[in-house]
A protein has these predicted regions:
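Acidic, Ala/Val/Gly-enriched low-complexity intrinsically disordered segments
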Residues: 2, 6, 11-14, 28, ...
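Structured catalytic/translocation cores of nucleotide/phosphate-coupled proteins
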Residues: 3, 22, 39-41
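Cationic, low-complexity basic patches in intrinsically disordered or flexible, solvent-exposed regions
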Residues: 12, 19-22, 27, 34, ...
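Residues at the start of alpha-helices and the adjacent loop-to-helix junctions
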Residues: 1-2, 279
Length: 456
């Protein structure tokens, strides 16, 4: 990775005394009146808003940011993490995937793994060194991938508001994944990777972000995958806090397990705390919040290892009950309700027939649901994609070429490419309190871990 910062940030970073005004934050939090309608699961109060909070980040100096930053822990396996961190002792993967520094046979959820995470974290703090911002702040984080650019606000969000559904969800979580990240947070007493949130865009916030990016950045580097990462410290965070009070709801785009783990860690730390006030750092979780019109969702494709005992002819007969099937089709769908299917060396196009289409505006109308309800479950016998070992998921950037490779090499019998889920679908499903099928969305570019750490 290439750094474009000429100077190292001083170890002690001093901010304007204006930030001390934010001591009043907890008073604002306490003054808001909130009641929950348990029958409908909806919030009722005089003013519905989601509040953001500045925090004193633990972070690398500017000229080390590119070395420290790592991809999210959950998008790579141990072997990939070990390869990425090779010959780079500052890579945050030594903290987020500490098993890479232990023998191959190590149980990923055993005590030695979490001990190694703590040891590596303390070593990184000393060797990098990581610096603690003296005063709470808010940051802007810009990612550029090719022609795509998005910029979001880095701040902490309230776990109370997560619990109360002011921060809305669209995905179920798995207990085993929660267990892992909860323990990781408690051992480190830190949240090291942000939750990816979104909101319905605001012209006021867009203008404020544009003004902030005119100043010098604290981080500016290009990662090995050619994605540019730039972070600015906001000089007047109170303006952003006030602006977000006009935003009714925040939505989890990616990071449901991180958010759920932060809530569980808070419950445990609250239990251990004497004189809990609700203003402790463990009551908030680290997030990057992007406007919905900048977020890029890519397809999350599927590959199946067999045809569930069916012959090719029987399989096609099953498909024709719901789809028009075209041979020599496209590898990438052009619209909703259309699917690419690679089977026996050829691409086919599946187009959902009108008489088989579910009602619009529901979870069942999503393409991931249509594929599940019309093909995977009734024809191929995949009833639970969360646990069935016969299905693999191919996200985002790997595209149709990866699907073709899996089938051509005999690692899959058939593969399906999907049209990407739309952001409006995600917001609508979240607003309705519904749950999307697993692996419905793949977001690119990916945020990096280790750049701005929230200590709890």
């Amino acid at each position: 990775m290439v750094s474009r910062l000429a100077k190292t940030t001083p170890e002690r970073i001093v901010f304007s005394n204006k930030l001390l005004q934010f001591i009043n934050f907890k008073q604002a939090m306490r003054s808001r009146k909130l009641s929950v309608d348990n029958r409908r699961g909806q919030l009722r109060r005089e003013e519905i808003v989601a509040v953001i909070r500045p925090f004193s980040a633990l972070r690398p100096p500017g000229d080390r940011a590119g070395e420290v930053a790592s991809v999210p822990y959950d998008v790579i396996n141990t072997e990939e993490a070990r390869a990425l961190a090779a010959n780079n002792p500052l890579s945050f993967l030594h903290v987020s995937r500490p098993e890479i520094d232990l023998p191959d046979a190590t149980d990923l959820h055993s005590d030695p793994v979490y001990r190694k995470a703590f040891e590596n974290f303390e070593k990184l703090i000393k060797d990098c060194p990581l610096l603690t911002e003296e005063a709470p702040s808010i940051y802007l984080y810009r990612l550029i991938m090719g022609d795509h650019e998005q910029i979001g606000v880095v701040a902490c969000c309230s776990i109370d508001e997560y619990d109360q559904d002011l921060i809305r969800k669209h995905e179920r979580t798995r207990r085993d994944k929660e267990d892992d990240r909860t323990r990781h947070m408690l051992v480190l007493r830190a949240q090291t990777g942000p939750v990816f949130l979104t909101y319905r865009s605001s012209r006021e916030i867009d203008t404020m972000m544009m003004e902030t990016t005119m100043a010098n950045a604290i981080f500016d580097f290009t990662a090995a995958d050619s994605i540019e990462h730039t972070i600015w410290r906001v000089p007047d965070p109170v303006r952003f806090v006030h602006a977000f009070r006009e935003i009714p709801f925040l939505y989890i785009a990616d990071g449901h397990h991180r958010a759920a783990s932060a809530a569980r860690a808070r419950a445990e730390l609250k239990e251990q705390s004497f004189g809990h006030t609700g203003d402790e750092e463990y009551n908030f979780f680290l997030a990057v919040i992007f406007p919905d019109d900048q977020v890029q969702i890519l397809a999350y494709n599927r590959a199946l290892r067999d045809l569930n005992g069916l012959s090719t002819g029987e399989f096609f007969e099953g498909l024709k009950k719901s789809f028009d099937v075209k041979e020599d089709g496209v590898d990438t769908p052009k619209r909703r309700g259309q699917f690419g299917m690679y089977l026996e060396g050829r691409w086919h196009t599946l187009s959902l027939r009108a008489d088989a289409a579910p009602p619009q505006g529901t979870v069942t109308s999503l393409d991931v649901s249509i594929l599940q309800d019309r093909v995977l479950a009734p024809i191929l016998g995949i009833n639970d994609v969360r646990t069935d070992k016969r299905i693999d998921f191919v996200g985002g950037m790997r595209g149709s070429k990866e699907l073709k490779r899996l089938v051509d090499e005999g690692k899959a019998a058939v593969a399906f490419s999907l049209y990407p889920t739309m952001m409006q679908d995600l917001l609508s499903v979240s607003d309705a309190g519904e749950i999307m099928p697993p692996k419905s969305t793949w977001f690119e570019p990916k945020l990096r871990d280790g750049l701005l750490i929230h200590r709890i």
